[in-house]
């Protein structure tokens, strides 16, 4: 947009320079002689005329209306009008007539397929209405530059300044006084420059300016030529210089509207040009009586000539106020309709396509197709070009045969309908689809909405999808005999495709099978038969339908709907939800409250193009619009169905609501429901209607369905791109959350495995501890038994010692048996000694045993001390887990 505005400004600047160059080149030649021959006392006529007009606005408007013309914009306060005689009226009418004749002459035809030259276009637009050559005019100005300098020196003399000052002071509100009061910075030289310009201003320049304003006012209705008061005050407050005067003069003439510029550069716009009134402009009042405060722009000097001054366009009122004018609305609608017929001055057809593709699905679809084509190799592009040529030749042959049908007297109803088709438009589509899609998307949408003629439907589809190529036919022939893993599944699902004839069933199987081999990532998904069947029916052979299917999948983005995970389908469902929320928030919120998701009922709509429900003829009309606008247009049909059934849907509960969405949502377009239809529906009910069931009990109104979807739901690529961004952002956030949850699940699983391992190790240690405790208890019992044996041995030793002492005591007593024979005593003593020795030996052995047992006791005591601490720890663990395995062990230590 900024480039368009800059070009318009440059065009306005060049146009103003052309007018001024023409004026100066015609009048500067005689300027020197006039000034030299004029005495100083006659400079009174050149004095600055006061700004107050002698004719009021009402008088001027009444005079214009008395001649049968529209009242022009107030020029007396805005436009510089030089001094003229009584012949102004005739000159003005002649100039206006010449200008109108030149404007109505169409310029050379523009080839839309070639890139535009901005500089060349601007030059042509400027020269066309005026018949001028800018370079020649500048050369003429350069030749007269010296004369102009001499003229300024003569007028700038002290005598001339005095005369000018006197004359200026004699006026009611002179310009010199105005400049002194307002700015206080104007010099005498500047005042002389202004006075010279007032005299030198040619009559024709002012007339052309006025007439040009009048013509512009009639063509571009609604453009207010009155200056903004704030801008005017700002200009008047500043210092008055030659640059300010030039800028103000240029500002007073409004810029040439874009529509008029385009009309001059296109032969097809003669109707729009003819809309300009052909009546001559009404005569203006004598210019010596009209006040002026500014002079036209002086010829530039030196380097200033290379830099044209910037124009200041008049500020129009707000759009809301201008839309109140019926003429402005009419002109706005004409400009909107013709915006596709004219190539803008930006100089590039691609730039127009890029801007249109942001708001129009047709232009967006063509841009995507072009991008896919540019990515292909040279051989592929040549093959596609050959396919395009073949389709065009096929269409030409069909038209030739069609002309022969016109010669037949007796034709049936179908042939009559065929003759009513706008074959000239479809010929234009076939020959140059790029131009039609780029410049006339609304016209193309209207024709496609009414339906592509069945006789050329396959040709148009292949041209739009750019799918016809010898390369794709060779691929089909090569893969036809290749084995497929999905053969049984394909044959089973094809039995559900009821609108395909038996003789076409095998061909349909081959097409789907070859595609599953051609694209192994997609393979085969249930629902492909509904997509491939209409293609096969409208193509000449299987190879063409295969190429068209590949084009839909690859170029139109249908492949993403059938990939594993169906990312494209999820995106379309999200876009459907957002569009439904935008068009009917109440219905969307109702579905959310009931827990109804679009995945429950809308997936088959997008996967089968509604073919699972509607008859073949109905589906073909949907395919027509899909090929021209893309699969995004399915969102229009889906949202339209929901909006038409909104009143019923908001009243149902979950179960009934889900059943209605699956089975009864399409009943709105049954022919039997026309009693409740609107006026538009009744008007379309006379169109095509197709049966919904084989028994013919129901029939659908396809024209009404398509018309409602295309006019009732407005979708732009910009909106879909915004929804795509939202979906990607949400999906990325969900993916990050899912990744985080997955990492937590993995970490949790690892921790669980560690816990299980620790529990296993703990069970092993627990078993070892239990065995050690049991062994400790057994040792404790053994120790107690040894202590008992020790005590018994000690008691035995004590008894033996007492016996020995008793025996010794007895021996020390007087032997009453001394009288006994010595031999007996000796033997008894020996026996006693030997017995004593034996007892001593046994006693030594017992003491050694006691020593050993004491050592064992000490060792067991040490072990017992160590085990006591271990037992206390185990006892606390057993209490924590509710186990009572150490109760007996504690009793032992007590």
Curated annotation (Swiss-Prot):
<feature type="compositionally biased region" description="Polar residues">
    <location>
        <begin position="268"/>
        <end position="279"/>
    </location>
</feature>
<dbReference type="GO" id="GO:0005934">
    <property type="term" value="C:cellular bud tip"/>
</dbReference>
<dbReference type="GO" id="GO:0016192">
    <property type="term" value="P:vesicle-mediated transport"/>
</dbReference>
<dbReference type="GO" id="GO:0005935">
    <property type="term" value="C:cellular bud neck"/>
</dbReference>
<protein>
    <recommendedName>
        <fullName>GTPase-activating protein GYP5</fullName>
    </recommendedName>
</protein>
<keyword id="KW-0175">Coiled coil</keyword>
<keyword id="KW-0813">Transport</keyword>
<feature type="modified residue" description="Phosphothreonine">
    <location>
        <position position="89"/>
    </location>
</feature>
<dbReference type="Pfam" id="PF23436">
    <property type="entry name" value="RabGap-TBC_2"/>
</dbReference>
<feature type="compositionally biased region" description="Basic and acidic residues">
    <location>
        <begin position="134"/>
        <end position="164"/>
    </location>
</feature>
<dbReference type="GO" id="GO:0005798">
    <property type="term" value="C:Golgi-associated vesicle"/>
</dbReference>
<feature type="domain" description="Rab-GAP TBC">
    <location>
        <begin position="451"/>
        <end position="630"/>
    </location>
</feature>
<dbReference type="InterPro" id="IPR050302">
    <property type="entry name" value="Rab_GAP_TBC_domain"/>
</dbReference>
<keyword id="KW-0963">Cytoplasm</keyword>
<dbReference type="GO" id="GO:0005737">
    <property type="term" value="C:cytoplasm"/>
</dbReference>
<keyword id="KW-0653">Protein transport</keyword>
<feature type="modified residue" description="Phosphoserine">
    <location>
        <position position="25"/>
    </location>
</feature>
<feature type="compositionally biased region" description="Polar residues">
    <location>
        <begin position="184"/>
        <end position="200"/>
    </location>
</feature>
<keyword id="KW-0343">GTPase activation</keyword>
<comment type="subunit">
    <text>Interacts with GYL1 and RVS167; and is part of SEC4-containing complexes.</text>
</comment>
<dbReference type="GO" id="GO:0006888">
    <property type="term" value="P:endoplasmic reticulum to Golgi vesicle-mediated transport"/>
</dbReference>
<feature type="coiled-coil region">
    <location>
        <begin position="732"/>
        <end position="872"/>
    </location>
</feature>
<dbReference type="GO" id="GO:0005886">
    <property type="term" value="C:plasma membrane"/>
</dbReference>
<dbReference type="GO" id="GO:0015031">
    <property type="term" value="P:protein transport"/>
</dbReference>
<dbReference type="GO" id="GO:0043332">
    <property type="term" value="C:mating projection tip"/>
</dbReference>
<feature type="region of interest" description="Disordered">
    <location>
        <begin position="1"/>
        <end position="324"/>
    </location>
</feature>
<dbReference type="InterPro" id="IPR035969">
    <property type="entry name" value="Rab-GAP_TBC_sf"/>
</dbReference>
<dbReference type="GO" id="GO:0005829">
    <property type="term" value="C:cytosol"/>
</dbReference>
<dbReference type="GO" id="GO:0000131">
    <property type="term" value="C:incipient cellular bud site"/>
</dbReference>
<keyword id="KW-0268">Exocytosis</keyword>
<dbReference type="GO" id="GO:0006887">
    <property type="term" value="P:exocytosis"/>
</dbReference>
<feature type="compositionally biased region" description="Basic and acidic residues">
    <location>
        <begin position="1"/>
        <end position="23"/>
    </location>
</feature>
<dbReference type="GO" id="GO:0005096">
    <property type="term" value="F:GTPase activator activity"/>
</dbReference>
<feature type="modified residue" description="Phosphoserine">
    <location>
        <position position="30"/>
    </location>
</feature>
<keyword id="KW-0597">Phosphoprotein</keyword>
<keyword id="KW-0931">ER-Golgi transport</keyword>
<dbReference type="InterPro" id="IPR000195">
    <property type="entry name" value="Rab-GAP-TBC_dom"/>
</dbReference>
<feature type="modified residue" description="Phosphoserine">
    <location>
        <position position="389"/>
    </location>
</feature>
<comment type="similarity">
    <text>Belongs to the GYP5 family.</text>
</comment>
<comment type="function">
    <text>GTPase-activating protein which accelerates the GTP hydrolysis rate of YPT1 and SEC4. Involved in ER to Golgi trafficking and polarized exocytosis.</text>
</comment>
